[in-house]
């Protein structure tokens, strides 16, 4: 049985100094997880208030809740690692572990599947947004997010069981995770350039009798969202690649026997990567695209929380008064009025020339 568990309160004499250092860091990790609970509530609030499509928001909230699942599992594991909760020596030798420790490992493995699949989930959501481009903003089509999240939950649950009971080598599972990240990134790029090329074709006044204003608007929105998701997918893929290498090494039984000290530090590095992954993903989501950055800064609660942290870096954005928030219908009508005025000017010029 493979557990995400590496006790540091009781180590061999030659590793006591190293274990003691990691022992105190684990206490810091517990504190960081307590701080992350309210900080990610801020992210959930911003996601609910975001101007994205219902399905994209739903998938984002699903992934955020998946991180809370990881926090629960990791918190319980940390208590076992520092000795607040203990495993009997004879039980550890016979690989008989308490149920809370087993469940906490399952929760952590489940989140690893979520981290690998987030890019694929948003890529498929953008696929449906591209396929139903004419009516995607008008109809929520909740079945898309429910279908993706349901399939995603089953896949992550199965992968967690496979990794826990070592049904497949960790190297195979790590390769599969990296492959999914790379494949979703390529799939995403194809969708991005499909939307970009189609919008460019429309803007060049080709097939004007086929395309409507709603198609123009939706393609423009798709490209804005994809600019943000491009950074998310790229960062997720790179992070998954690094974490896959670390996980494969320190979960290898032969590596544990040959390099116990390196295994201890790799386990420590993996946990650091998970913490950094969540914080950096938050930064990327909020600060990647100026339009969305301005939107998040217009939320009063977000401005109060983030100004002490990033106010100097984005003084121009924070110095502006919060923008008036429009509904999707208002934004759509404003966009259509602008396009209609441009078309009217063009047709007036054509009529003048014909006269």
UniProtKB/Swiss-Prot annotation:
Keywords: Membrane, Transmembrane, Transmembrane helix. GO terms for biological process: sensory perception of chemical stimulus. The chain crosses the membrane at residues 28-48, 56-76, 102-122, 144-164, 172-192, 232-252, 268-288. It is a multi-pass membrane protein. One of its GO terms (cellular component) is membrane. Belongs to the nematode receptor-like protein sre family. This is Serpentine receptor class epsilon-1. It comes from Caenorhabditis elegans.
